[in-house]
């Protein structure tokens, strides 16, 4: 897809895992130019497997050929926080950054953290983002955990929302716009 392919030209994302690319596009769509320049933007990320494709590649090399063949090019992407660090650098986010690793409810916890940060005036706006990449290992894990029996439809990609304090005259409802 052209919107995803353009991120491969970004030097910071040249060798990153797919989840970082998915999240970069979701962040780009959620942030407008005004928020990209704000000082107090926070970032909360929710995921369950992280960059599992690179993790599997890294550890399969270690297991099959020994620790001396562990690729230093792959290792940084095995850390759950790597997509968040890429996003913070790409978009100049200088506020708090946090990664939640969990099940399908991690997204709700990410929204709660954003709400707390805004209430405590830690951030003026918080980019809440969730993403996943698929791999046979992840699909096997979802099967073992019974997530498919609960109705999980596995997919890969990312989605993001920008959370901010409601206006004083707001009724507290959530407005979704294009």
Labelled PLM ranges:
Residues 23-33, 83, 90-91, 97-129, ...:
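Active-site-proximal alpha-helical scaffold in enzymes
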């Amino acid at each position: 897809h052209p919107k995803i392919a353009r991120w491969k030209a970004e030097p910071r994302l040249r060798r990153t895992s797919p989840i970082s690319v998915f999240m970069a596009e979701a962040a780009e769509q959620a942030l407008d130019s005004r928020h990209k320049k704000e000082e107090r933007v926070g970032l909360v990320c929710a995921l369950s497997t992280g960059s599992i494709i690179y993790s599997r590649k890294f550890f399969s090399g270690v297991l099959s050929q020994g620790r001396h063949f562990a690729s230093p090019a792959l290792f940084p992407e095995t850390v759950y926080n790597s997509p968040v660090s890429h996003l913070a650098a790409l978009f100049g986010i200088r506020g708090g950054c946090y990664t939640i690793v969990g099940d399908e409810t991690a997204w709700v916890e990410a929204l709660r953290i954003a709400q707390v940060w805004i209430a405590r005036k830690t951030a003026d706006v918080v980019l809440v983002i969730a993403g996943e990449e698929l791999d046979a290992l992840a699909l096997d894990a979802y099967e073992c955990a019974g997530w498919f029996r609960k109705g999980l439809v596995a997919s890969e990609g990312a989605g993001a929302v920008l959370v901010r304090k409601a206006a004083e005259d707001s009724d507290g409802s959530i407005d979704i716009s294009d």
